[in-house]
């Protein structure tokens, strides 16, 4: 599925345990249709000790969210994204109000 979202875009979570939260996209996996949003969908990950002298750790890490569960968020408005060409330049805009991004 082709997505119009880019790394660094501000998005709103539409479903799941973090529903309603807003964050920036840290990475996009286009093959699996997943995004990682900064400080959202946090999970605990156990890191084993590599040597007997080291201790294991538990860290918080962002887990991936399906692209269909996020929506672009700009200046208090969440909307679908559209693309149009103006003067041979690709412009991304909000479909709800036509605002350019």
Swiss-Prot record:
Instruction: Output the SMART domains linked to this UniProt entry.
Output: KOW
GO MF, one example: structural constituent of ribosome
Recorded hits in Pfam families, A to Z, give: KOW, ribosomal_L24
Q: Does the keyword Ribosomal protein apply?
A: yes
Which Cys pairs are S-S linked? none
Q: Where are the transmembrane segments?
A: none
Q: How does it assemble?
A: Part of the 50S ribosomal subunit.
Its family remark reads: Belongs to the universal ribosomal protein uL24 family.
Query: What's the protein here called?
Result: Large ribosomal subunit protein uL24
Give the organism, scientific name. Borreliella afzelii (strain PKo) (Borrelia afzelii)
Q: Which gene encodes it?
A: rplX
């Amino acid at each position: 599925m082709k997505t119009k979202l880019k790394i660094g875009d501000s998005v709103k979570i539409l479903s799941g345990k973090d529903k309603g939260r807003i964050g920036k996209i840290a990475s996009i996996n286009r093959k699996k249709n997943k995004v990682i949003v900064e400080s959202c969908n946090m999970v605990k990950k156990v890191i084993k000790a590599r040597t007997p002298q080291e201790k294991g750790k538990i860290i918080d890490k962002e887990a991936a969210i399906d692209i269909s569960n996020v929506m672009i968020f700009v200046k208090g408005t969440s909307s679908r994204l559209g693309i149009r060409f103006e003067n041979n330049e690709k412009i991304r805009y909000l479909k709800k109000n036509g605002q350019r991004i």
